[in-house]
A protein has these predicted regions:
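Bacterial Sec-dependent N-terminal signal peptides
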Residues: 1-23, 630, 653-656, 660-666
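Generic signature of intrinsically disordered, low-complexity, basic-rich segments
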Residues: 5-6, 15-19, 41-50, 369, ...
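Short coil/linker segments at helix-helix boundaries
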Residues: 213-214, 292-303
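Exposed, low-structure sequence patches enriched in small/polar residues
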Residues: 113, 224-290, 302-666
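A generic structural signal for short coil/turn motifs at secondary-structure boundaries
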Residues: 12-13, 125, 157-161, 415-417, ...
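Membrane-proximal, glycine/serine-rich, low-complexity loop/turn segments characteristic
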Residues: 19-228, 237-251, 264, 429-439, ...
Length: 666
């Protein structure tokens, strides 16, 4: 580790010295890559804004409302259906999505000067501190080559017993952009561990005198998750030369600016041949020191302790040919065809059984009932199964132009375990002037047939086992968005509808089930930001309706942020405000600790409680230094104590937080 830190420091020093010698202006370009085609999606660059710094964390960045165990590091699920993303093809990764950096989430950069950021945030609670450290660095080692690294470390003890979580994640990335040959490569990692407490034994303790950390909890377990990914995207473009007139300015002998022009030769790609290689390994482990005292329903393998694990290794190779949009000046669109092969290794614990001990699932009774007697092998055996899938697909797109852009893509699995799986996606957006401002309109749709995750079909652990024959899930989604930002009001409305056929969910007993029919979900997402020179009010309102109790959603989810902002003494940017999060009552699913899945329940509703934070945010311009202080959930001290993430799991009580972020660039 010391050697790695030394290499990073040396590389940073070399790049900063080179930038200082050349005295060039700071220009930065950033992009991410599409998961199927590897095509770059250009971004604006590093976000150096000081606004809303206290609210930025892994969970809030994922969705405006999430179910968790109330700790910053926790298995989680968005309460907003259309925010839920499956980024890794591994069932047990779903609950850790906010903490995963996939190759498609890695940002690549081209910078004229090196850029780095260091951030530290801390929650102050006696012996239950919360710490977050972020570091990022990127810089060009030559005109065409860029290298960078990001590192995030989070450690949060949680406010209740047996709730501590830790995660260490980051990425190392590099890119080369030549006239004909280019490549992007990355290695990303995530290691996460969190203790499981099953919620409070008695929720009435919230109304008593016990401190949160002294309230009895229902179990003692631990979960660990690891994700590693390597990625290489490289391509060669056949180009034609094109002359372009370039206007520029330079000083004459007397120091006056004069306008000049010249002819620049640029390379326009005609056809691009691309190869993408990706390998990732995801694994999940669940441990209990005493299986007999677990709140989980059965014991299949070891009556004294639980040590379950499952993993999925995925290797992908993609070959693609692109007919570039830049060269197609007649029809003004680009096209791509590709073939992708995916090889997966599924490894899980399998064993033989002896005592099947039934415990009341998620109940308060720990009385064991022997329901069956079978033979037990005390050791854990491991079963390995390889699967292979081959896809063909294509895209048609128009990214250039001022007014209308579109993209259509699709693929189908022709061979392998996922035979017959397919997806068709499309989007169109248009922008035009309306009065003094610009309006944008967009529409999206997809139709997908999805093969159930391997571990939804086959799984064996100390508490659960199943062999299912689920059918493919069909999903049809259509949606539209309209935005019309003006000087004082910035409204944006998104309406989305989805029909899900053969939806798979986890039932109250922790077993996966498939709905024999269709479920409809409708959501209206309205954002209205009111701005004045000094006071802003940001509003985010989401309405959701689900036609089935097997897909529970809150009807309304709200986020409001009222704040004052100004510049003091022409040197200090200031933001002072209060924000609130709220969702209406509903039958929230409850976390199953052994599976890391959220199971439906119809016993208790949670919601109708606002979580309010007050904060102050500062930016010292001359130092490029951001500072903040926040009193989180301050209303917990004077409102009723019926605040729950899900049944049995209270929200975190009030806490004081502070932090800083420092940017370094020439």
């Amino acid at each position: 580790m010391r050697c790695v830190c030394g290499c990073i420091a040396a590389l940073c020093n070399i790049m900063f010295v080179q930038a200082a010698e050349k005295a060039v202006p700071t220009v930065m370009r950033a992009w991410q890559l599409d998961s199927w085609t590897g095509v770059a999606d250009t971004l604006s660059g590093i976000d150096s804004s000081y606004m809303h710094l206290p609210m930025r964390n892994r969970l809030n960045d994922y969705s405006i409302s999430n179910i968790s165990n109330s700790n910053l590091i926790s298995p989680s699920q968005s309460r907003i259906y259309f925010d839920r993303q499956k980024t890794v093809d591994f069932l047990f990764a779903d609950a850790y999505t906010p903490y995963i950096i996939t190759p498609q989430q890695v940002k690549y950069y081209h910078t004229t000067t090196p850029y780095s950021t260091v951030a530290y945030k801390k929650g102050f609670v006696s012996n239950l501190d919360q710490n977050e450290i972020n570091f990022s660095f990127t810089g060009n080692v030559s005109r065409r080559t860029n290298l960078g690294i990001t590192i995030d470390y989070l450690n949060s003890y949680g406010r209740f017993a047996n709730q501590e979580g830790k995660t260490f994640l980051g990425s190392v990335f590099g890119s080369y952009n030549g006239d004909h040959y280019s490549l992007q490569s990355s290695f990303s990692w995530n290691t996460l561990s969190n203790f499981e407490n099953g919620g409070l034994q008695n929720v009435a303790d919230l109304q008593g005198v016990l401190k949160p950390e002294d309230m009895p909890v229902r179990m003692q377990g631990m979960s660990a998750f690891r994700y590693l990914a390597g990625y290489l995207n490289h391509y060669y473009s056949i180009c034609v030369e094109r002359e372009r007139k370039v206007n520029y300015r330079e000083r004459d002998e007397e120091g006056n600016w004069i306008k000049k022009d010249s002819i620049k030769i640029e390379y326009v790609p005609v056809t691009t041949f691309r190869h993408i290689f990706e390998v990732n390994d995801a694994s999940k482990r669940y441990v209990e020191k005493s299986a007999k005292q677990s709140i989980l329903p059965n014991i299949y393998r070891n009556p004294t302790a639980t040590n379950d694990s499952a993993s999925c290794l995925t290797i992908k190779n993609t070959l693609a040919v692109t007919f570039e949009e830049e060269f197609n000046t007649l029809l003004h669109f680009g096209a791509m065809v590709y073939v992708m092969n995916e090889c997966q290794r599924h490894t899980s614990a399998i064993g033989q059984t002896e005592n099947i001990i039934h415990l009341e699932p998620f109940g308060n009774s720990y009385n064991n009932v022997i329901s069956n007697t079978l033979h037990l092998m005390p050791d854990t055996l491991y079963g390995v199964r390889w699967t292979n899938n081959t896809y063909v697909g294509g895209t048609l797109y128009k990214h250039r132009g001022e007014h209308i852009h579109y993209g259509f893509d699709g693929n189908v699995c022709l061979l392998g375990y996922k035979l017959g799986e397919f997806q068709v996606n499309g989007h169109v957006d248009a922008g035009f002037r309306l009065g003094k401002d610009s309006m944008t309109i967009a529409a999206k749709a997809f139709f997908r047939s999805e093969t159930p995750d391997y571990y939804l079909q086959h799984y064996l652990s100390n508490h659960y086992r199943w062999n299912n024959d689920f059918q493919k899930t069909l999903r049809l989604r259509v949606g539209g968005e309209i935005a019309y930002p003006t000087q004082w009001v910035k409204p944006k409305l998104n309406i989305t509808f989805e029909n899900v056929t053969k939806h798979i969910y986890f039932d109250t007993d922790g077993m996966p089930k498939q709905v024999d029919g269709s479920i409809q979900v409708l959501a209206a997402d309205l954002q209205v930001n009111l701005t004045t020179p000094w006071v802003n009010l940001d509003n985010h309102i989401i309405y959701q309706h689900s036609s089935s109790e097997y897909l529970p959603l809150p009807t309304l989810t709200l986020y409001h942020n009222l704040y004052y902002h100004d510049c003091w003494f022409k040197a200090l940017d200031v933001q002072i405000g209060v924000d609130m999060r709220f969702f209406t009552k509903y039958y929230a699913p409850i976390l199953n600790p052994a599976l890391g899945q959220f199971c439906v329940q119809d016993i208790e509703q949670v919601g109708n409680y606002p979580v309010m934070n007050v904060y102050a945010n500062f930016y010292v311009k001359s130092l490029r230094l951001k500072l903040f202080a926040q009193y989180q959930h301050f209303n917990a001290s004077f409102m009723n104590k019926r605040y729950f993430e899900m049944p049995g799991y209270p929200m975190a009580p009030d806490m004081f937080r502070a932090g800083l972020a420092w940017h370094f660039y020439k």
